[in-house]
Curated annotation (Swiss-Prot):
It catalyses: D-glyceraldehyde 3-phosphate + pyruvate + H(+) = 1-deoxy-D-xylulose 5-phosphate + CO2. Pathway: Metabolic intermediate biosynthesis; 1-deoxy-D-xylulose 5-phosphate biosynthesis; 1-deoxy-D-xylulose 5-phosphate from D-glyceraldehyde 3-phosphate and pyruvate: step 1/1. GO terms for molecular function: 1-deoxy-D-xylulose-5-phosphate synthase activity; magnesium ion binding; thiamine pyrophosphate binding. Keywords: Isoprene biosynthesis, Magnesium, Metal-binding, Thiamine biosynthesis, Thiamine pyrophosphate, Transferase. It holds the Pfam family DXP_synthase_N. Catalyzes the acyloin condensation reaction between C atoms 2 and 3 of pyruvate and glyceraldehyde 3-phosphate to yield 1-deoxy-D-xylulose-5-phosphate (DXP). This is 1-deoxy-D-xylulose-5-phosphate synthase. It is an enzyme of class 2 (transferase). Homodimer. Gene3D superfamilies: 3.40.50.920, 3.40.50.970. GO terms for cellular component: cytosol. It comes from the Bacteria.
Amino acid sequence: MSFDIAKYPTLALVDSTQELRLLPKESLPKLCDELRRYLLDSVSRSSGHFASGLGTVELTVALHYVYNTPFDQLIWDVGHQAYPHKILTGRRDKIGTIRQKGGLHPFPWRGESEYDVLSVGHSSTSISAGIGIAVAAEKEGKNRRTVCVIGDGAITAGMAFEAMNHAGDIRPDMLVVLNDNEMSISENVGALNNHLAQLLSGKLYSSLREGGKKVFSGVPPIKELLKRTEEHIKGMVVPGTLFEELGFNYIGPVDGHDVLGLITTLKNMRDLKGPQFLHIMTKKGRGYEPAEKDPITFHAVPKFDPSSGCLPKSSGGLPSYSKIFGDWLCETAAKDNKLMAITPAMREGSGMVEFSRKFPDRYFDVAIAEQHAVTFAAGLAIGGYKPIVAIYSTFLQRAYDQVLHDVAIQKLPVLFAIDRAGIVGADGQTHQGAFDLSYLRCIPEMVIMTPSDENECRQMLYTGYHYNDGPSAVRYPRGNAVGVELTPLEKLPIGKGIVKRRGEKLAILNFGTLMPEAAKVAESLNATLVDMRFVKPLDETLILEMAASHEALVTVEENAIMGGAGSGVNEVLMAHRKPVPVLNIGLPDFFIPQGTQEEMRAELGLDAAGMEAKIKAWLA
């Protein structure tokens, strides 16, 4: 994919931050306009995260203009907003390959560029890493500066506040920029407030402030009076008391779309000592009206026609597994007012929009707080309610201790609806749902189910919801279901699989939604095919029966082979001294990069052709 760079004459001059800093300051507003148009042109033709990057154009330009990157270290939280950063740091001509197999990584990635200081993808990690980087820079002694950019969603997570609390204690020289992209510019953002921000960040104010501290340090009453006076003056127009209490020097809020004003403020703050906090207000989707009006829809986009202002509509084919879950959730809630549903800021992705509208008093979006989500669910269960935690596989990792300590040990009936299990596609290493079976399987009192289709998914959700002896989990993938008929809901017998096809010599034990591919292989090789359904408890009787009646077994799962469902089958056979050969097919022992689900399954040998080739090579 190529772009006519001549349409962007100022941007054409910039393929590195060194070239950016050669531009006269007066040309930067024009650069921002071109950068925003280039981003629209590229993402609309390739797909990707969109609205966040439109909102950080001026901030990105200002940061790279003021700071000597990559010597000075710039850290982006999550990374959805970092497309302009990639464009300005030598990757302009490759931006059309982002999120594609072999293309640019969807997030800042250390292995891709020296400008990407921290590999990211999950939220709220930037300040913690930034403190460590700032401390290391201080010990290095080369006056290397550290800047972290974090959004108003990510900063709500406990990890961010833990980090800020630590920064206030050890006081490293660093800047945290809060990118506050609420739907409208705060009423505090205007000429007066921008002027105040520049004044408060200026050297004169800072010198007077520090000098006053020294002069009156021996006169506590006067020192305390001056401190209170400063707090009252700032408090009238500055909403930063919390950050000041955490030990930061707070500046803002300022207009995040005034690139020249940002440069002035950043230059003032660059040489200040201790932890600094700059609060900027931006508009998500800035410069593209449809994205400004609906930033959630335009957060991540497929290929689309910018002139239409609309994203392509779904073809109306098979429902996604997320929708299957959402429909089941609404159906069950209508019958049981004890049902409570919890999501850590994933309402749309988890299929909970309709539920949130129909049952607002039983819907809880706890924000980016996975640990709290799980323990909150534990509390609801203790109170006699039936909590369901809808969460992506990759984000459940962040609440592992809570699953163990707050739910499983207490045998609380919490249902985990684990979306995005297995290969997720374009978001790459940080988002693959590769490990949930491995990290949940070792937890006592846990029931773990792997549906092979949408009907089985519904039955398993129903089974888990009515299981009262401890926690349960149902894991299902990103993408569409397979089109089977939905039957009336009924509880499945816990820990029991079913034989789908009888064959000879070889038995394939399938866990989950790779079943259609496994069925093709079983037909081709005349193998027995088993839908195992439960990873925990395993159907040991069925496993031993298959071992006794077949020459070899193959396990299939879209999870890491190490510690996964296949490992559980191996353990059963070894415990019963059954030396039958077993081939475990699943995700290999490396982090799976980006690519479509189809591309990655084919590359990893998890489609029918790949599985059959692996089995034949193993049997040869």
